[in-house]
Amino acid sequence: MQAVQPALAFLEPQFDPWVFRVVRLGLPWWLRWTKGIREVRLEGGEILAEWMAQFQRGQVRLILAYRHPTTADPPCLIHALANLLPPIAQAKGIPLRQPVHAHFMYDRGIPLWAGAVAAWLLPRLGATPIVRGRLDRQGLKAARSLLLDGPFPLAAAPEGGANGHSDILNPLEPGLAQLGFWCQEDLLKAHRPEQVIILPIHTRYQYLGDPEPAIAKLLTRLEQDCGIQADSGLSIRERLSRLGEQLLPQMEQFYSQFFPKPLTQALGSGDPEVLERLQRLLDSALRVAEFNLNLQPQGSLIDRRHRIEQAAWERIYCLDEAGNRQSPVEWGLANRIAQEAQLHLWHMRLVETFLAMTYPPHSPAPTPIGEAESALRFWALISRLKGQDPLKLPTPQLGCRRASFTIGDPVNVSQRWGDYQRNRRQAVQSLTDDLQQALMQLMHSH
C-alpha cells in the first residue's frame, strides 16, 4: 500500500443468470485445479431439497448456516447446490426450479485481496457484502432485503469467517440469528405467512490419499525459514510442535524488545503454559495496533480484530471526490496515514494466522486433515513474518481432497418470535447458542 485509496463502494448484488451458468459448468474444474478438490458430496441432500422446494413454493424463507473452515467452502457449496442437489431432488420426486442457488454473504475485504475479478464476479452471483468491525447499515439492509424477497435462500457462515480448522468451531456471532428475527418481523409487517428456517450445514474435508509426504516436504521448507535443523525421525505432530516452540519465544522477544512496555508487559511473566503464553502474545500484538489506531482494547479477540481492521480501512480507503483537489502537502500526509495504517494492520493479520499454534499441543488424536491444516496455517504465519501476504500467494497443495456437506435438523426462527418480543437480546443469544450446539453435534458425529 503506497497511497491512500478510494473509499470502498458498496457492491450491489445483481444476479446474472448467464454468469451463473458459466460458473456452474466451470466450478468442478476450477475446484479440481486450483483447490485440489476432486469430489464434493452432499449428505442429507433430501432434507435440503425439501426445504428448498418449500422456499420456491413461498412457504418458508431459508437461511443456510454453514461451517467455514476454509475459503473453498462457498464455491464448494455453490457447486453442491447447483450440480448435486437437483439430481437428488429428482430421485426423490421433489420438484425444483432452476437455477438452484443461494445469496452468499461475504466479507467486504475479500475483493481487496482476491482482486478485480472477485469484485466483478461476486455481485453477479447474487452475493452480498458485509463490513466487519462496525454497524454496516447498508450491508445489513441489503442482506435483510434478500432474506425477505430474494429469489434464493441466504447463505452465511455464522462463525464470521474461515477459521482454518475442521475440528474447531469458533464461537458464533449473533448477526445471523438477528437477521432471522428481522425477517420474521418483516414478514409479519407485510402480513405474509412464511416461516423463517435456519438449516445448519457441517463442512468437512478429507484427503483422498496420504498427505504425509507433502506435509513433511512443506514442513522442511518452513523449518529452513525458521533456522531449524531438519530431523526426519520426528513425526509430523512433533515437527509442528517444534515449529511452535521456535516461533512463540521469538515473537515474545520481538514484541517485548521493540514495543512500549505498557503494551507488552504481560509477556515477561514467565507463565509455563503454552496456551496462556500464546493468548498473552496475541493480546500484546493487538494492543500495539490498537494503541497506534487510537482504539481501546475491549471485547473478545475477534471483536478487537474487527475493530482494528475497520479503523485501518478508514485511514486507507478514504479518498472521495474532494480528495482530488487536495494540495500536494495534504496528499502526502494522507498517503503517510494510509501507509502507517497498513503497517498497524499487520499486527492484526499476524494474530489471525498465529492461531495455528493452538493445534499441535491440544488435540489428543491428530488426523491427517488436522495436521495438514496446521501445517498450512504455519505456512501462512511464516509467509507473513517474511513480509509476504499469504492471501495473495498460491496455497501449497498437500494432496487431492473430498469436500462433504452434511445437512442438520432445521431450526425454526418463527416459533421463537414470542421469546424475541419478550427479550430481544436473550432470544438472539438463545438462538445463537442452539445453532452453535447443532453445528457441534454435526461436527462430532463425523
Identify the meaning behind each predicted range.
Residues 1-100, 108-109, 114, 132-133, ...:
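Membrane-interfacial terminal anchoring regions of lipid-handling membrane enzymes
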